[in-house]
Amino acid sequence: EKVDPPDVPRDDHVDETRLHADDAEALLEYYRNNADDRVRYSRDHALLALAWYTGARLGGLRSLDIEDYNQDEEYIQFTHTPDQDTPLKNGRDGERIVGLPSHICDILDGYIANERHEVYDDYGREPLLASQLGRVSKNGLRAWMYLATVPCLHSDCPHGNERPTCDFVDYSEASKCPSSRSPHQVRTGSITWQLNRGVPPQVVADRVNTSVRVIKRHYDQPTKLEEMRERRQDHLDSLDFEDEGGDGE
């Protein structure tokens, strides 16, 4: 006998914590408009900009080399190289080329020219997102992202703290800030934002290396306000007495 699956609440399926588009925009504007080139072209800016505009996973971001960035054609290329400690989650199926907006390329150009550590990894490759010692570890990159997304960079602390005395602005403590975000949470926010901007689901899926089914189930998470706007756009015009046919009798 066929048994219908239980009606599981949406919150039980997914973790809806993400970097929201408004916060991403405020953070990126803080970096982009900063008068100090050390901030404008910082590693944190390059990391957040890449993560937001590509929707890439942590492993994909970590895998990038300088040669994977094509300045002239304005794209980044993800390559699966498991024998050199940079695998992609989906293996060869995860390999792809992702186009970048010109202003993101400007950031990467400035970062590479001014702030990137000129180092090699254990295999003689030049990691794009480099630490002082070479290719950053996964935990290290995760810590960088937490630090890059603390909200007091662009506005008053939403938790009542003062930046000069807040422990969360330290590299080792940023993950404890309730409003900082992990690479996965940035990816989730990016995918939702791309969909809300009208990019077709299949195009988003190709850019971020997942399926449309997975996007719909795990990443397409509009807020209540976004859901209202979608309902209004699709149906509000129908809720008008003046559009009804006949004389009303």
Where are the model-predicted features located?
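N-terminal DNA-binding recognition helix of tyrosine site-specific recombinases/integrases
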Residues: 1-4, 57-59, 152
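Conserved tyrosine-mediated DNA breakage-rejoining catalytic core shared by Y-recombinases
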Residues: 63-110, 117-119
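Major-groove DNA-contacting interfaces characterized by cationic-aromatic clusters
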Residues: 105-144, 156-166
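Catalytic-site neighborhood detector that most strongly recognizes the C-terminal catalytic loop/helix
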Residues: 208-233
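C-terminal secondary-structure termini that scaffold catalytic or DNA-interacting sites
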Residues: 234-249
